[in-house]
Each structure stands twice: as structure tokens, then as C-alpha cells.
């Protein structure tokens, strides 16, 4: 009777370990699939561009790969985003996005052409430099005419995806 109990217990343990092992292998396979999907998404984001139109001038910007930018891309995929932007301190234009995005703020020193998220719901475009805690959105590729387009006072900027 004791031998039968030990044999049954051994069979249950072997079957249990086998089930755990196959589940583990399945999880590794699923993980590899998820990783490859995330890599494809990341590769797409590192080459994704948006257009910033101010008046009759358009500028292309290379986008960062972060949660805020992915959320912004989703918004732009639905329709272009138009933001009224005011001058602030003679080095940036600031405007409300109308909703909050996920932030990943880091202390950075901006340069002309940088586009960042401030306070989760403010888009800031720089034509000067500033040090503050921002979430990077993107950077204008060619600054020719950038400062002139931003000019003095308020502007309306239209953000859209580049196809």
C-alpha cells in the first residue's frame, strides 16, 4: 500500500512538473512574440515624422519614442491638431493641447527646434534655449525659417503626421 502511494505521488509530481515546464515554454514563446511586436513599434516610431505648419510655412520634425509621442501620434492619426500658441519669455511658444498625455519628464536643456510636453498638456516649441523638466516630443529637422515663422506674439500651429 505504501509503495502504491509513493508511486502515485511520484506520478502526480512528474505530471505537475511537466505541465509547469510546458507552460513556461509557452510563456517564453509568447514573450518572444510580444518583444518582436514592441520592436516593430519602436522601429516605426524612430522614423516617424510630423509636420508643423505655421502660417504658410511647414517644417518636418522627427519624433521621439515615448508614451506621450505615441498618444500624440494617435491623436494626429484621427485629425490634424491645431494649437494657438503664445510667446513666453522670448525663447518659446506655448499652447494647450486640450488634454493630458503621459509624461516622462527629465531635466533637459532645450535647443531651437525642440518640441516638448510641459505639465502634461502644454506643447512647447523652442526658438531659443531653456533648462527645465520636460517630456521630449520631437525636433524640427531643418531650422531654416523656423524663428521667423514663430515671429513675435501668438501663432497657430497645426501638427499632422507626415505620410
Please give the residue ranges for each predicted region.
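Short, compositionally biased
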Residues: 127-142
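C-terminal motif of bacterial Sec signal peptides marking the signal peptidase cleavage site
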Residues: 15-19
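Well-ordered alpha/beta subsegment
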Residues: 138-163
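Second-shell loop/turn segments in exported
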Residues: 55-62
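Positively charged n-region of N-terminal signal peptides that target proteins for export
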Residues: 1-4
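N-terminal, intrinsically disordered, polar/charged segments of Gram-positive cell-envelope systems
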Residues: 24-49
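Sec-dependent N-terminal signal peptides
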Residues: 6-13
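Mature extracytoplasmic domains of secretory-pathway proteins
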Residues: 68-119
Amino acid at each position: 500500500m505504501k509503495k502504491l502511494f509513493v508511486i502515485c505521488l511520484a506520478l502526480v509530481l512528474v505530471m505537475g512538473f511537466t505541465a509547469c515546464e510546458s507552460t513556461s515554454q509557452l510563456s517564453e514563446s509568447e514573450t518572444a512574440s510580444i518583444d518582436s511586436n514592441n520592436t516593430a513599434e519602436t522601429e516605426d516610431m524612430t522614423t516617424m515624422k510630423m509636420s508643423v505648419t505655421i502660417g504658410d510655412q511647414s517644417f518636418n520634425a522627427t519624433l521621439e519614442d515615448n508614451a506621450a509621442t505615441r498618444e500624440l501620434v494617435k491623436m494626429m492619426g484621427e485629425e490634424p491638431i491645431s494649437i494657438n500658441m503664445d510667446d513666453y519669455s522670448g525663447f518659446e511658444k506655448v499652447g494647450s493641447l486640450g488634454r493630458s498625455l503621459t509624461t516622462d519628464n527629465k531635466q533637459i536643456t532645450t535647443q531651437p527646434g525642440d518640441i516638448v510636453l510641459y505639465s502634461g498638456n502644454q506643447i512647447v516649441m523652442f526658438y531659443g534655449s531653456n533648462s527645465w523638466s520636460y517630456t521630449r516630443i520631437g525636433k524640427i529637422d531643418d531650422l531654416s525659417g523656423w524663428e521667423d515663422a514663430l515671429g513675435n506674439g501668438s501663432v497657430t500651429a497645426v501638427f499632422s503626421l507626415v505620410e
